[in-house]
Amino acid sequence: MNRSYTACIVLLCCVGIAQESVGQTASPIEPLVLDWEQADWGPPSSERPGFPVGIRNAPIATDPETGGPTYLARFPAGSQFAMHWHTYTETVVVLQGTVSITLDGAEHTATEGNYIIIPGKAHHEWRVPEDADVVLLARRDGPADFFFVEP
């Protein structure tokens, strides 16, 4: 058997073993099925500069590799989240209601089922209409942080 052929067989066996062992590694994330209406909502927030009063969060999970949280956020009717940015990308799904978002200077209206990608460092603010709360499902690609932008 020539050396090239033997090297290929050894390489293929090693790749096969590596792939098999990767497939057998358990995920550090636990399975979850969640009815967001039954989530463990935290108390309404108090007044803090830039943050809407009365927002409620329900933590769902934190990615053990990136530190990125997944959580529910309920913004009260008529609330506003001042212009800010985050280090990491944030993805959001509107679960209930309607929200207006200014994202890097462009105005958008998002309704139930809409998907929003907010790239890291993109300036954005949220405004909730006066008639109803909005519920969002959000996930960050890294630890949560907030940097407010001066008007």
Model-identified regions with their sequence ranges:
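Cleavable N-terminal signal peptides
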Residues: 10-11, 16, 21
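A short, N-terminal "cap"/entry segment at the start of jelly-roll beta-barrel domains
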Residues: 22-67, 151
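Conserved short histidine dyad/triad with adjacent acidic residue
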Residues: 66-86, 119-120
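Glycine- and acidic-residue-biased ligand/ion/polar-headgroup-sensing regions
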Residues: 76-77, 86-104
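Short acidic-glycine-tyrosine-enriched beta hairpin
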Residues: 104-121
